């Protein structure tokens, strides 16, 4: 952008959560760009407008391939601020493991955030341990897909679940946008169960920050605080009145948090 100090300009790479796509950053992206930053929002495989079908994606690494290809193309002298939301924290961690030298800091928003000690499945299981045991799934559906001999199950959020658990602080129009654009979710539980811990040399060498969403009814707020305290970050922030989708319900505040993190640590 003309007139922007090149030293202050940052490159933010935005990684969406399960079922979502690059579209979910539609409010935040122009806000960061209006501040002079470069912003790249990606679609992971079988997400957003990516043309892959869910039954064509076997592993979490496959699912994360668009992000890994983007990171591979980043020039050696450039570093990005990697921003992962929700389940996108796993893809963010994979990118950190493979390209630590290209990331100035990774920011996790209401997201799973592994460490360099435990396997990823440890944190995957903790999400369910922290979640209410008697939670009503409402109109969420579990659907089989793929090979009939070895079927997998996908999750499809219904309008009631979206509006009351994930987008409860968003407008009717924003919720309808999600209803129209969300795609089925596969959580790669079997793949995660076989994965080894991320390394201290790769993932563990990248600075981390965390942004808690204070009214999150989807990803337990208590678990978000637990991750901050037990996994460790160099900066933690909390967005008041934010539901799980802070980039939609509180985009200005999220932009401010990201700017403050970038200014402080980059």
Curated annotation (Swiss-Prot):
Keywords: Alkaloid metabolism, Hydrolase, Serine esterase
Segments crossing the lipid bilayer: none
Boundaries of every AB hydrolase-1 domain copy: 11-121
Annotated InterPro entries: AB_hydrolase_1, AB_hydrolase_fold, MES/HNL
Active site (record annotation): 86, 216, 244
Gene Ontology MF annotations: hydrolase activity; methyl indole-3-acetate esterase activity; methyl jasmonate esterase activity; methyl salicylate esterase activity
Keyword Hydrolase: yes
Catalytic activity: 17-dehydropreakuammicine + H2O = norfluorocurarine + methanol + CO2
Tissue: Mainly expressed in roots.
Family under the similarity heading: Belongs to the AB hydrolase superfamily.
Function description: Hydrolase involved in the biosynthesis of curare monoterpene indole alkaloids (MIAs), natural products such as strychnine, a neurotoxic compound used as a pesticide to control rodents, and its pharmacologically active derivatives, including brucine, used to regulate blood pressure. Curare alkaloids act as animal glycine receptor antagonists. Catalyzes the conversion of dehydropreakuammicine to norfluorocurarine.
Protein name (database record): Norfluorocurarine synthase 1
Organism in which the protein naturally occurs: Strychnos nux-vomica (Poison nut)
């Amino acid at each position: 952008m003309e007139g922007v100090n090149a030293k202050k300009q940052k490159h933010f790479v935005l990684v969406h959560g399960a079922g979502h796509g690059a579209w979910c950053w539609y409010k935040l992206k122009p806000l960061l760009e209006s501040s002079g930053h470069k912003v790249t929002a990606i679609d992971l495989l079988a997400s957003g407008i990516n043309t892959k079908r869910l039954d064509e994606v076997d592993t979490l690494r496959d699912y994360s391939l668009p992000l890994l290809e983007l990171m591979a193309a980043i020039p050696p002298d450039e570093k990005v601020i990697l921003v992962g939301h929700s389940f996108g924290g796993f893809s963010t961690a994979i990118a950190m493991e493979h390209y630590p030298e290209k990331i100035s800091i990774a920011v996790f928003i209401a997201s799973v955030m592994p460490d360099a000690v435990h396997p990823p499945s440890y944190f995957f299981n903790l999400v369910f341990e922290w979640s209410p045991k008697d939670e009503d799934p409402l109109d969420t559906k579990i659907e089989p897909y793929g090979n009939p001999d070895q079927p997998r199950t996908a999750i499809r959020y219904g309008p009631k679940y979206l509006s009351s658990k994930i987008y409860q602080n968003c407008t009717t129009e924003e919720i309808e946008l999600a209803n129209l654009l969300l795609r089925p979710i596969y959580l790669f539980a079997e793949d995660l169960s076989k994965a080894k811990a991320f390394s201290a040399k790769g993932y563990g060498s990248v600075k981390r920050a965390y942004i808690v969403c204070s009214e999150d009814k989807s990803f337990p707020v208590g678990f978000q605080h637990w991750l901050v305290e037990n996994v460790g970050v160099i900066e933690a922030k909390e967005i008041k009145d934010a539901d799980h989708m802070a980039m939609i319900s509180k985009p200005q505040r999220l932009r401010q948090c990201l700017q403050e993190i970038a200014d402080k640590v980059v």
